[in-house]
Amino acid sequence: MEKTQAKPLTAAQQRQRDKKRRTWLRAGVQLFFFVSMPGAFVAGFSGVKQLFLHIGAGEVLSADSFTLSLLGLCGFTLLFDRFFCGYACAFGSLGDAVWALSGLVQKKLFHRKKQFRLPERAVLWGQKVKYLLLAGLVALYVTRQEKLLTGASPWEVFSRLTALRLPPEGFGVGIALLVLILLGMAVQPRFFCQFLCPMGAAFALLPVLPFARLHRQSEGCIPGCNACKQQCPVCLKLEESSLRSGECIACEACVGTCPKQNIHRWDMALCKHLWLPVLGKALLFFLLGCWLGFCRFI
């Protein structure tokens, strides 16, 4: 008796299979980093705190573990885009898990076919908040007023919980903020990353090498498709010269959903228009470093 050969997969079925594989692979990588280095985000931001505390005091920056963590994360981001945000940040992975659980609850209990999320206009405005938050924190650190934040840090509460330690007394505000952030994660993908993450704001400002970013070959796209934007947690439609490209968290959700496979990384031909803004950012950081160094001798 002859065996019937399995029918070859259609292009749509193959894309769906590849998308599932990519999703499970990313989840595995996120779980690995969540278990192995849950405190990387807190360590990196503690480096930001140490940097501006030393600047405010007019002291030479010490090469402690927090500073080295910050330099390592920034250097990695310059070379490989925001891979840390998309795959390795424990807080971001928590947001993905809460968002996935929220979708399951909405589907099973409330029979919603489409998961609720905030309107795009609200998202685009909300993304600006993290830059204001970063500026406010920097101002507090430079002026040596960091004690005003004692007990109010939600990521410090999260760091203690991942280390299986309860927050000490006096962290009521931080616990309340963490609960509110978790609720936000249920109604918007990457809620904290988009709206409140000061490290995300810092990473978005870095002059990432253009060929490390994701790029879309727009001339090969289906007119009116927008599949990449619909899947993007930060409402970003990839363009060759997007001014919002720093908001991309390198989760690669767009790569798996593109029906024409037009989204790529490490393609020099697609990023030739991005070198000028990158060099501009690099120059600004250089001038900032020179100014900070000059201020030490005034």
PLM feature spans:
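Non-ligating segments of multi-cofactor redox enzymes
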Residues: 1-230, 234, 238, 246, ...
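Short alpha-helical catalytic segment bearing the HExxH-like zincin motif
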Residues: 249
